[in-house]
Structures are given as structure tokens and as C-alpha cells.
Swiss-Prot record:
Native source organism of the sequence: Rhodopseudomonas palustris (strain HaA2)
Gene Ontology molecular-function annotations: rRNA binding; structural constituent of ribosome
Name the record gives this protein: Large ribosomal subunit protein uL22
Known role: This protein binds specifically to 23S rRNA; its binding is stimulated by other ribosomal proteins, e.g. L4, L17, and L20. It is important during the early stages of 50S assembly. It makes multiple contacts with different domains of the 23S rRNA in the assembled 50S subunit and ribosome.
GO biological process, one term: translation
HAMAP family the UniProt entry points to: Ribosomal_uL22_B (MF_01331_B)
Database matches in PANTHER family: CHLOROPLAST 50S RIBOSOMAL PROTEIN L22-RELATED, LARGE RIBOSOMAL SUBUNIT PROTEIN UL22M
The family this protein is said to belong to: Belongs to the universal ribosomal protein uL22 family.
Keyword Zinc-finger assigned: no
Keyword tags: Ribonucleoprotein, Ribosomal protein, RNA-binding, rRNA-binding
Record-linked InterPro entries: Ribosomal_uL22 (IPR001063), Ribosomal_uL22_bac/chlpt-type (IPR005727), Ribosomal_uL22_bac/org-type (IPR047867), Ribosomal_uL22_sf (IPR036394)
Keyword Transport in annotation: no
Lineage, uppermost ranks: Bacteria, Pseudomonadati, Pseudomonadota, Alphaproteobacteria, Hyphomicrobiales
Length: 128
């Protein structure tokens, strides 16, 4: 038995992709997500290609997945796509310990984050 089909929550001109369990803090991931919010998909890919942030590789992979979802699943025009939303959420936090002096220990927090990218097809503006 399969699960019942859910209604599509996004409008017909949007597609999304989600990347979970990214091993980076949400604060650092949000710095890269701010680069692509509101930009055209091609320009956002170029920005991520030449970004020096380590997590930009994973953000680029998620954006490419959203573009592929728009093209293959929803029949949207790739050239007219804009990154409408880029949400960053908190994931789990792995806790490790580091031995310190005098038999004490220090905590090391290894945070994870989640990224949701929504791309929208915009209509070409008619120039007069």
C-alpha cells in the first residue's frame, strides 16, 4: 500500500529542492543563502561557482536540483527561473567532548543545518 497523494502546496510556476543534514552552522549557511535570494537562477549558479565558502558546493547542488525539478517535473522554462526563496533551518547538534586539563572536559558542538530552495518562473516583461 502506498501513501495517499498529497495536494501540491506550491503554485504551478514554482519548484523546490531540500538539502538536509548539511554539516555547517545555520548562521554560516545563511551567509551563502543570502547571496542567491531573489537572483536569476543562472546568475546564482555563477555566484556559487566562484564563492570561496566551503558550503557553497552543497548550496549549488541543491539549486541545480531545484532547477532540474522545475524542468522535468513541472515543465517550467529554465531561462526564466528566479530563486524566490532560500530558507535555512536548524538541524541536529552533535555533542562531542574535548579533554581539558585537571581531568575536566569541554563541550564541542557540531551543528547541522537544512536548506530549502524554491525557484519561480517569471513571465518575460514586454518591452515597448
Amino acid at each position: 500500500m502506498s501513501k495517499p497523494k498529497r495536494e501540491r502546496v506550491l503554485p504551478d510556476n514554482e519548484a523546490k529542492a531540500v538539502a538536509r543534514m548539511l554539516r555547517v552552522s545555520p548562521q554560516k549557511l545563511n551567509l551563502v543563502a543570502q547571496l542567491i535570494r531573489g537572483r536569476k537562477a543562472a546568475a546564482a549558479l555563477a555566484d556559487l561557482q566562484f564563492s570561496r565558502k566551503r558550503i557553497a558546493v552543497d548550496v549549488k547542488k541543491c539549486l541545480e536540483s531545484a532547477i532540474a525539478n522545475a524542468e522535468n517535473n513541472h515543465d517550467l522554462d529554465v531561462d526564466a527561473l528566479v530563486v524566490s526563496e532560500a530558507h535555512v533551518g536548524k538541524g541536529i547538534v552533535m555533542k562531542r567532548f574535548s579533554p581539558r586539563g585537571r581531568g575536566r572536559s569541554g563541550r564541542i558542538l557540531k551543528p547541522f543545518a537544512q536548506l530549502t530552495i524554491v525557484v519561480r518562473q517569471v513571465e518575460a516583461e514586454a518591452s515597448a
